[in-house]
Amino acid sequence: MKAFLVICALTLTAVATQARTMDRCSLAREMSKLGVPRDQLAKWTCIAQHESSFRTGVVGPANSNGSNDYGIFQINNKYWCKPADGRFSYNECGLSCNALLTDDITNSVKCARKIQRQQGWTAWSTWKYCSGSLPSINSCF
């Protein structure tokens, strides 16, 4: 049991050292470089703010179905990514959940865009905070 706890602690430490906290403009600029249309950036930055406070290394608490949400966009491990503990996942994005926790947001952006294309903005419970008028991101560029 002690060995298991040590391994878990080391894994979390390794993931945490690769994570970072972004801000609205750094996220908007990186997402733009990754091909996200500029007219969507205010929505994405709002979602990231409300889901993770712009932190890439966040693993949310267990949901009512036992699943967890990962990364800057809090992507669910039952449907979109493969949890490290081997639990069943549909893994629609074809990646490990730990790939959503690093300072490189490429995987998170690709997966989040897939979710948005399939389910729309309401896939995020925080969308209610982002569906109205949002501050412009023009000053970020």
Swiss-Prot record:
Disulfide bonds join 25-140, 46-130, 81-97, 93-111. SUPFAM superfamilies: Lysozyme-like. It comes from the Eukaryota. The active site is at residues 51, 69. Salivary gland. GO terms for molecular function: lysozyme activity. GO terms for cellular component: extracellular space. Residues 20-141 form the C-type lysozyme domain. One of its GO terms (biological process) is killing of cells of another organism. Its EC number is 3.2.1.17. Keywords: Antimicrobial, Bacteriolytic enzyme, Disulfide bond, Glycosidase, Hydrolase, Signal. It catalyses: Hydrolysis of (1->4)-beta-linkages between N-acetylmuramic acid and N-acetyl-D-glucosamine residues in a peptidoglycan and between N-acetyl-D-glucosamine residues in chitodextrins. Residues 1-18 form the signal peptide. InterPro entries: Glyco_hydro_22, Glyco_hydro_22_CS, Glyco_hydro_22_lys, Lysozyme-like_dom_sf. It is an enzyme of class 3 (hydrolase). Unlikely to play an active role in the humoral immune defense. May have a function in the digestion of bacteria in the food. PANTHER family: GEO02684P1-RELATED, LYSOZYME C. Belongs to the glycosyl hydrolase 22 family. This is Lysozyme P. It comes from Drosophila melanogaster. The lineage of its organism: Eukaryota, Metazoa, Ecdysozoa, Arthropoda, Hexapoda.
